[in-house]
Amino acid sequence: MKFKQIAFIFFLLIGYTLLAQDQIDYKADKIKFVKNYKGGAKRLIGHVQFTTKDGMYMTCDSSYFLDNNNIEAYSNIFIRQGDSLTITGKNAHYNGTTKLGLIDGNVVCTEKDMVLTTTVLNFDSKNKTASYQVGGTIVSKENTLTSKHGYYHSPTKTVSFKYDVKLVNPDYTMLADTLKYVTSTKTVIFLGPTNVLSKKDKLYCEQGWYNTQTQISHLTKKAAIYTGKNILYADSIHYDKKNESGNAYSNIRMIDTVQKTIISGNHSYSNKKTGIMWVTNNALLTKIMGKDSLFATADSMFAYEKKIKRLKMTLADSINHIEKDTTITKDEKDKKRLKIVKDTLNYIEKDSSTIKAYHHVKIFKTDVQGLADTMIFSAYDSTLTLYHLPVMWHKVNQLTGKLITVFFSNNKMDKIYIPENTFIISQIDTAHFNQIKGKLLWGYFKDDTLRKIDIVGNAQAVYYLQNDKKKLQGVNLIESSKLTVNEKKGTLNQITFHKKPIAKILPMKDLNVKEIEIKGFSWQDYKKPKSKADLFKKDTKIEITK
């Protein structure tokens, strides 16, 4: 919508309206003086015409022309200014003393390709204002604007629309309570609830502005942007449409409704061209998982949106046809197979998001907690991976390794993977700990509980033996190439060793627990986040497990 052109219509009305001129020429089929009408007036009847030196022209069926250029015009009002502006209506009134006037009755103002229609159009030539207060519509080549009130103030070069404002454009629809346009700065100001709807996104705010020249907008007060599956909330959003980039400030929440994730913080930057967004200042990731949620904090978080191609092959029918053809030699069959594979490779594009968290990463869930320097959450394969000195706690168990990856299925933990330097510790009391160390770990969850663990490669275990009353009886020291641990009554305590384990049992008497600790033992429970609030407490240095 060309707000500047709208302002120009109003400006012509109040600055050059024929009714406001000091010198007016007139003629009609019949002119007479009516003495008893408002102290005396000229009565003009039939083909009435008024003209001014600057080219304004008005016609009507009849009129009263009083002193001080007071004019009352009736029926078939037509006003023309220059070659571009015309106004039609039923009646027109102007008071030369107060400088107030109006045109009523199906008023139509046309300026080039823009048309303003209303029932009553008011103007004040002294204060240089024009308005309608009973509803109006402005139609241009590609836009239609409607509102209950419209107002133009010439001294400030401001045009305003209020109540049920609606702007319809081929690219978007704008719904607002109040809009102002300042012609000097070419800026649209939003006052009150405002929605901007397009095919790609929806924008909402209750205060803000948009510069039509620079295409930069600033949204405040309940600012929100809805884009596909994503929603962005913030106290304020500053957006550059040309560069498709923006910043958000204070109480930021970016919601992915498909992946059920929320990234929050107090400062963010996003760029649609690169598909990147970052959040800092109390950055928090919330992963909604049924009745529970997983929370993660870091110094900064980055979100990436990109399309990933997945391979789809439909080979079965064609290959079966080749196998059934016994007249084809083996070499010919192999060549045909290769051709079929090449010809039938189909790629399906799928939207995927990745969230990366850097430095001082902390995780809290009711039954899982964690620490690391870096975290990556991938929506493509539904994984959460901790890098650089990761520590994870699951109920009574502490897990460490070179990196830790958790796989999700249907928003529940499904598997856990540690490729190297696996170490599991579970506390029995303040002095005694069950310990398992090995190279590679695969763990399996059921109902968010770790039910089974397989450790492959140089497996070692320190496992305390207890009687029915939980009293320690001794300790089992075992080495094996592979071991399996199963859950029983909420704890991982059923250990199965494979391929000729080496084992010995030591009694508790005179046992030195430090001497039997597996190399790299490091119990870090004091660092474990005990609540969501702990995620924002000052960090303690993460220890290295070798």
Question: Each PLM stretch: what is its role?
Answer:
Residues 1-25, 545-546:
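Bacterial Sec-dependent N-terminal signal peptides
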Residues 20-546:
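N-terminal amphipathic/hydrophobic interface segments
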